Amino acid sequence: MAKSKNEVHDTGAESLENALTRTEQYIENNQKSLTVIVLAIIVIVGTFLGYRKLYIAPMEEEAQTQIFAAEQYFEKDSFNLALNGDGNYLGFIDIIDSYSPTKTGNLARYYAGISYRELGEYEEAIDHLKRFSPKDKMIGSVAYGAIADCYVELGKLEEAAKQYVKAAKYGENNFSSPIMLMKAGTVYEELGKFTEAVKAYETIKAEYPKSAEAREIEKFITRANMKL
C-alpha cells in the first residue's frame, strides 16, 4: 500500500531528527578531539600568515633591492658580473642562495639560466631554467625556449624539439609562439621527422597568419613536404 503524504513527511522529519541527534552525539563524544583539530588548524594558518608577513615580506623587499645591480649588468650583456656580482653588489647566484623563498629569488633563476646560456654553459643554464617557476606566460615561453636552445647546442635534438613545442603552447601568443614553432620545425627537419615539421609550419600558417614567420612559411611547408 502506498504511503500517505503525511506518513512520508513524518518519516523524513524523523530521519532528519535522528541524523541531527547522531551528529550532536558525535560532537559531544569527540569534543576534545575536535577542539584539538580546530586549534591545530588555527595555529597552522596563523603560522603561515605570520611566516609570509614577518619573514618573507621583508626578505622580498631586501631581495628586490639587491637584484638591481645584477639586472643592470644583465642588460649590458655583462653576464659574468650579473651571475657572480662585482664585489660590492650580489650576483644572481648569491641572490638565489640568499633569497630562494622569494619571488625575486625565483626570477634570479631565470636570469641565471639565460646568462649561463649566453656564456655557453648549457648544462648550468638548463638546471636553473628548469627550477624557475614562471608566473608570466611570456617569460615562461621564453624560458622553455631557452632550454630548447641549450639542448640544440648539446646535440640533444629530440629534447629540443619537445621543448620548443612546449614553449609555443605555453601562454600562446602572436610573438613567441610562431618563433618557437619555426625552431621546432627546423629541428624536426634535422631529425628527418618531416611530418612533424610540416605540422609545426602549418600551425604557424593557420594560427599565426599575421606573424613575421608566416610571411615565408609556404616555402618551408613545401620544402618539408618534398622531403617526405
Each language-model region and where it sits:
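Short solvent-exposed coil/turn linkers within tandem alpha-helical repeat scaffolds
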Residues: 57, 96-105, 119, 133-141, ...
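N-terminal positive-inside, membrane-proximal cytosolic segments immediately preceding the first
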Residues: 2-40
